[in-house]
């Protein structure tokens, strides 16, 4: 493939990277007075990048001699990433203005650059492309976590994320070096051909280290330790971003590496994935029960949900991968809706309300917000008829079809345990004695509109999208096999 044809495959990344540089120039000369305009410019760039997926960038095949892959799988993941990133940019100005943190023009630019990295991650066809994309996303994320530099919690979150992220990157690089040393290539196709001839001890160790590095990025147990502290300390729009877009990118990257690069060693890596899935669902469900902070509880909820998504990968089939992609699509809607609800929860003094006990009385002062948050909690718990039930059903169905019904039974049990803390929040909102402090009225029609859209998406109306989701997720999954 010619250089021009290869570049045509990377149009989404070109749009975001060139746009980020132009917006950075505007910020340099215009200052923070242009911050809101730059933010909406970033949203427009994400929309343009998503629209470009209708061309060769959506299904053009491999480019740059296999280093970059533009297929249905990458297009599906990128669309979710761009939606989550755009929402995270759109809701940020209101939060920073209310908290006095100061909304600066660098925020949307960092999200754009992170989007470029995530796009490279899901389209990677080579271990080095994987690493460059992952590091571009991570470096932007470290700065975003500590964006409110005068807030000690935010600074602490950024430092913890940076130190542990650097450790995970080192582990990943070591795994890449082992795989290169024992297979003689960094291309996914070449690694797959090498493993098809038999997996040696060195190759197995390389695979384990690569999986460990990627597990950190998706907060899978036992590499989850950074998640509760970073989610709690980072600004809430940043936390919403961390819990959605990078999760999709990391999960998509793990799926591509497992199926395309290491499909010949499925029986070996399945043991790792099964352990991570079980540990994540169990720890996420149990550890969340004792939490008092809303953001920490949602952090453990994200760990729990990653475990369920990994069950689809453990099935090792196209049905399992399609179920995982459907799970991530619905998860993005539920998570963004939940965090925007948290953004709306403020006292009369304008300060955020982040403790679960403070939610008592929300149903009286903000009945609409309380109802929406309850919908998201029930949906995250997977309680029918809400749409959050459907992806869990697909994941368990894929496990049973693959013959792993004991794993499905454990997953169902942890889902029941996890429902406890979601129901605890609903009970606090509707049945506990009202807290003395009153909630401030809604201050953003945009946030209210986004909450409404997300609530409708995870309501029973979401089942109308099943034919579309099934078709697109299965097309995405089949492009890996």
From Swiss-Prot:
The keyword Transport is annotated on this UniProt entry: yes
Domain of life: Bacteria
Keyword presence, Nucleotidyltransferase: no
GO cellular component: plasma membrane
Catalytic activity entry: a quinone + NADH + 5 H(+)(in) = a quinol + NAD(+) + 4 H(+)(out)
Pfam families (UniProt xref): Proton_antipo_M
Family, similarity comment: Belongs to the complex I subunit 2 family.
The protein's assembly and partners: NDH-1 is composed of 14 different subunits. Subunits NuoA, H, J, K, L, M, N constitute the membrane sector of the complex.
Function: NDH-1 shuttles electrons from NADH, via FMN and iron-sulfur (Fe-S) centers, to quinones in the respiratory chain. The immediate electron acceptor for the enzyme in this species is believed to be ubiquinone. Couples the redox reaction to proton translocation (for every two electrons transferred, four hydrogen ions are translocated across the cytoplasmic membrane), and thus conserves the redox energy in a proton gradient.
PANTHER family in alphabetical order: NADH DEHYDROGENASE
Protein name as it appears in the record: NADH-quinone oxidoreductase subunit N
């Amino acid at each position: 493939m010619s250089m021009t044809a290869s570049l045509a495959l990377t149009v989404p990344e070109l749009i975001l990277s060139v746009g980020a540089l132009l917006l950075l120039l505007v910020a340099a000369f215009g200052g923070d007075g242009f911050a809101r305009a730059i933010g909406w410019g970033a949203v427009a760039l994400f929309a343009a990048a998503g629209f470009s997926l209708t061309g060769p960038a959506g299904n053009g095949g491999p480019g740059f001699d296999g280093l970059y892959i533009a297929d249905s799988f990458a297009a599906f993941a990128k669309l979710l990433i761009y939606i989550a990133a755009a929402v995270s940019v759109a809701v940020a100005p209101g939060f920073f203005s209310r908290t006095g943190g100061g909304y600066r023009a660098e925020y949307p630019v960092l999200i754009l650059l992170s989007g470029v990295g995530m796009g490279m991650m899901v389209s990677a066809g080579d271990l080095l492309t994987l690493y460059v994309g992952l590091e571009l996303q991570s470096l932007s994320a470290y700065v975003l976590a500590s964006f409110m530099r005068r807030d000690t919690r935010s600074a602490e979150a950024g430092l913890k994320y940076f130190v542990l992220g650097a450790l995970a990157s080192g582990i990943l690089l070591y795994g890449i070096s082992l795989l290169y040393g024992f297979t003689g290539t960094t291309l996914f196709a070449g690694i797959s051909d090498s493993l098809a001839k038999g997996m040696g001890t060195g190759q197995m160790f390389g695979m384990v280290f690569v999986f460990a590095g990627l597990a950190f990025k998706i907060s899978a147990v036992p590499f989850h330790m950074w998640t509760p502290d970073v989610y709690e300390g980072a600004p809430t729009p940043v936390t919403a971003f961390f819990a959605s877009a990078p999760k999709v990118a990391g999960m998509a990257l793990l799926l591509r590496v497992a199926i395309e690069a290491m499909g010949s060693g499925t029986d070996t890596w399945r043991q790792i994935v099964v352990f991570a899935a079980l540990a994540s669902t169990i720890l996420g469900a149990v550890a969340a029960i004792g939490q008092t902070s809303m953001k920490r509880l949602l952090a453990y909820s994200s760990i729990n949900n990653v475990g369920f998504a990994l069950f689809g990968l453990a099935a090792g089939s196209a049905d399992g991968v399609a179920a995982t992609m459907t799970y991530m699509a619905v998860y993005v809607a539920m998570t963004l809706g939940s965090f925007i609800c948290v953004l709306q929860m403020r006292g009369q003094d304008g300060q955020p309300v982040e403790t679960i006990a403070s939610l008592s009385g929300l149903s009286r002062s903000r009945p609409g917000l309380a109802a929406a948050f309850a919908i998201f909690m029930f949906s995250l718990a997977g309680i029918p008829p809400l749409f959050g039930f459907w992806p869990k059903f697909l994941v368990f169905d894929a496990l049973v079809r693959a013959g792993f019904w004991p794993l499905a039974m454990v997953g169902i049990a942890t889902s029941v345990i996890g429902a406890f803390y979601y129901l605890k929040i609903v009970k606090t909102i509707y049945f506990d004695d009202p807290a003395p402090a009153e909630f401030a009225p809604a201050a953003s029609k945009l946030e209210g509109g986004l909450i409404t859209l997300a609530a409708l998406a995870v309501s029973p109306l979401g089942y109308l999208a099943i034919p579309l989701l099934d078709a697109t997720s299965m097309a995405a999954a089949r492009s890996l096999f």
